[in-house]
Amino acid sequence: MLPELLSFVVREGVLERSRALSVFGVDELCEALHRELGYDFFRGNRRRMLRLLIDLLVERGWLEPTRSGDRWSCRRDGIPLPGESPAGATEGDGQVDFFRRCLRLVPGYLRGEEAPIAFDAENVRVWEEFLGCDEFQACRSVLLDRMASTSGASASLLDLCYGPGWGIERAMDRWPEARITAIDFTDVFAANAKCRAERGHARNAVRGRPSSPVEWFGPSDWKGFGYPLPFPEGAFEAVLFSCGDPYIRPDARDAVYADLRRVLAPDGTLGILTRGYPDPEHRHVPSHWLRVTALIHDFTESVCAGWHGFPDVGENQAMFSRLGFRGAWNPGGAMNIMDSALWILKKR
């Protein structure tokens, strides 16, 4: 995906305008791209998308920051280095295919078109394949295995924003004795998720393992982030929250996670699958390629309705501590691993 995104930067003329400005800040580049390319930075997350591009180009050495850190100069002429040139369309997994689909929609979106991908019936298959990609499935397994070691195999589990049901299926495999409750603010995925739950029950029955029915909650019970969950205090020993965090509005993050803490039992466990925004110090997201992947992911999924992006890892840590969580990955109390992609938190 990196070659394709860099090709977009050259093809659209973003790099050319950056070079023409010599040294520039975000405001100057926004003005130039609005004037010359028709980009609309006055609505939604489009201005943030430009900052994502800048950070990606810095990461790859195409732009160089000044000492102040908020202005840049162009170091490249757009001629690709080895590994930066598109090699033609190759078959990818659900994640790569999703990024490509989104990237094709970026030019129109930057010029003011409405977000073309939403959590609706038209895009069920798109989300099905993306959220079920190999990387996310492997991460769910790691997350659930570690959560089980801290919560016990018979925990009551809430799957927040269950989507197509990939997390439910993994949870039933990893935690066969768990009492699972699933909730989402849309019911467009309900049929697929319930099919996965039924398959999970069938597999557990063949293996002679107990498996409780899933309890389902939908948009008539919960309207989404910013609304309280319809459960009493301390209702669950564990909460699984995979791939939904970037859809929380920045001004609602404290309230959303405070409510998750409310529904957790004392010493309950919260497991989160997301990505962390690459920090300039390379402390929270040190791996170059994971940094590049996070920026590509954040930029491309920005064309999806409701996307607010990956949060700052340090701000996340401070928020969780302030709200009454502690890290639970190891005896040292780390909150996250894998360059801040997997989080396990305990309710203090």
Predicted features and spans:
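A short SAM/SAH-binding and catalytic strip from SAM-dependent methyltransferases
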Residues: 237-252
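A short acidic, Gly/Pro-enriched loop at the edge of an enzyme's catalytic core
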Residues: 226-239
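Conserved class I S-adenosyl-L-methionine
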Residues: 153-163
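Class I SAM-dependent methyltransferase SAM/SAH-binding core
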Residues: 158, 168, 173-227
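A short glycine-rich, Lys/Arg-flanked "PGG" loop and its adjoining helix->strand segment in the class I
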Residues: 254-266
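Conserved alpha-helix/loop element of class I SAM-dependent methyltransferases that forms part
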Residues: 134-153
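N-terminal accessory segments
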Residues: 1-105
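C-terminal alpha-helical "lid/dimerization" subdomain adjacent to the S-adenosyl-L-methionine
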Residues: 273-322, 330
